[in-house]
Design a protein with these regions (language model features):
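Short, low-complexity, Lys/Arg-enriched N-terminal segments of secretory-pathway carbohydrate enzymes
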Residues: 1-43
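Membrane-interface recognition of transmembrane alpha-helix starts
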Residues: 37-55
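C-terminal accessory segments of proteins
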Residues: 44-46, 50, 60, 66-371
Length: 371
């Protein structure tokens, strides 16, 4: 059973280009005609002063325009986007099973590449390690809280930027629509040697999170440096559930349940239900890395959260006039303070912190994507 929701499409007005045209200014009266009275040329002092002033203004204006253009065309924002660039043609993120073999291979290679790049936030480790580390570092304010959806929207965008900027990836983040695989998630097309690998090796001893080492696929042999709060080098681990327990977990994301969640009328109710059901399903069914907040060590994490972002986007598009700015609920699970669009999203040093208001629209200049 396929899960389709046909939201109302929001029509965006074209955004005026930020490029500025530079016009050369020429003074047609700039030539000075003087009369010769012999071997020397006489020039009115007032005219001379005027000529000097015009030259100074012209040179100053030329250099000002030059430096302005240099700034406009060389400055990059903290998210890797050129400042004068506007979102005119948003990229479309696609479901994993719809990608070609070449597109899948390019994505997997870019993810592997992150493990070869130096850390941005610590003195050791890799860029790959940074994402689970930051996810754990910020977890108390980004889970069971209103910030869950907006924080992860920005977080996965930073991940996509890293794939592009550091590893030359040219595609977009794919997503995994687990509602298509609710009856037997272990047979989902994201698993297998040519995808993200399979279940952990049941013949080996238990690793972390009731999982075992993944021994097939491009991430076999990957070393995860942290497990929750602890420095604990270990293999990429998974421990698939099966039987009646798996059936119960699958029911959390079956199409009918997801469709019911999409009918929630306010952000707080929608966000709470989507976080509760999706997190219970993924962490309970895959286990291993997903058992703790260092779950981003499993590369499937990003396909999972891109799907959550997709569902939020669909929910927003059902009533864009109101929902593109609708954000409410508890700001943190340990406080009664209400959430605000002015709340800060702490990215743990991966990129500059932003306000929630900055990440509400996926077709903004910051993101420029759709589903």
């Amino acid at each position: 059973m396929m899960f389709f929701i046909r939201p109302q499409k929001l029509i965006y007005s074209p955004v005026e280009s930020f490029d500025r045209e530079v016009e050369e200014q020429k003074d047609n009266d700039s030539r000075v005609v003087v009369r010769s009275t012999g071997p020397t040329i006489g020039l009115n002092p007032a005219w001379a002063v005027g000529i000097v002033m015009l030259l100074c203004l012209s040179i100053g204006s030329t250099w000002a325009v030059y430096f302005e253009q240099r700034l406009l065309f060389s400055f990059k924002s903290v998210n890797g986007f050129v400042s004068q660039w506007k979102c005119v043609n948003p990229a479309t993120r696609q479901e994993w099973r719809t990608l070609s073999g070449q597109e899948k291979a390019e994505y997997l290679a870019a993810v592997q590449c992150l493990a070869t790049k130096p850390s941005r936030v610590r003195n050791n480790g890799t860029l790959y390690d940074d994402f689970p580390w930051v996810h754990r570092y910020t977890s108390t304010s980004t889970h069971k809280a209103s910030a869950f959806l907006p924080w992860h929207r920005y977080y996965i965008q930073i991940y996509e930027n890293a794939l592009k900027d550091d590893c030359s990836y040219t595609g977009t983040l794919p997503y995994w629509d687990w509602s298509l695989d609710w009856e037997d998630f272990s047979r989902a097309p994201i698993w297998g040697h040519d995808n993200f690998g399979s279940d952990g090796n049941l013949d080996a001893e238990t690793s972390v999170g009731d999982g075992h080492c993944v021994i097939d696929g491009p991430f076999a042999g990957l070393t995860a440096m942290f497990y929750d709060n602890d420095y604990y080098p270990h293999c990429l681990s998974r421990g698939f559930k099966s039987g009646a327990e798996m059936k119960d977990l699958g029911n959390l994301v079956r199409p009918g349940v997801v469709e019911d969640i999409m009918r929630e009328g306010n952000f707080e109710a929608f966000a709470q239900r989507i976080e509760h059901n999706a997190h219970r399903f993924v962490s309970g069914s895959i286990r291993g890395e997903f058992s703790k907040f260092t779950g981003p060590y499993d590369p499937v994490f990003f396909l999972h959260h891109t799907n959550l972002d997709r569902l939020w986007w669909i929910w927003q598009m059902m009533d864009p006039k109101n929902r593109l700015q609708e954000y409410n609920g508890k700001s943190n699970k340990d406080t009664l303070r209400r959430a605000s669009l002015d709340d800060t999203l702490d990215m743990g040093g991966l990129r500059r912190n932003l306000a929630v208001a900055d990440v509400m629209e996926t077709t903004s200049d910051l993101f420029c994507y759709q589903y």
